[in-house]
Amino acid sequence: MATVTTLSRAAGGRGNPSNKPYLVEVEIDLAAAATAKGSALAANDVIEAITVGANTVVMFAGAEITTAPSGGTGASFDLGITGGDVDAFVDGMTLTGASAGTYGTLANTATPILVTTSDTIDMLLLGTTPDTAGKVRVYACLMDVDSVGSSKEADEVARDYLA
């Protein structure tokens, strides 16, 4: 089993990531993942897709096939948090034979997950022979739940001393 880390993208994205929900996405190229690994992808390989910071709630996450996968036999994947629930968001999405535009069905247990220490949303490859080509868009709606700061007293910023 191998973990491919070079395709992971730091949390950020559209919207205002200051204690408001925001969307993060990354496109996983299966051929690039194999190149980054240094050998063919195999069952039980983990592809880290999205880095999630500490004290962040993953409100939901999902996957969409953007380029039809090929070169595999009976391949599928789970989407979740490998150190926790590996199929928290998508359970057994088919890769082999899937068409572009196919979305993974959210797992019945897909509920918000609080990530208290930095972690990643991962694809866990399943099946006989994972596909060697194709692209999958992984997306997540995140929200920082860290403290918004202090008491907001007037002495917090230098400009307040100028008056």
Put a short name on every predicted segment.
Residues 2-163:
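Surface-exposed, low-hydrophobicity beta-strand/loop segments enriched in small/polar/acidic residues
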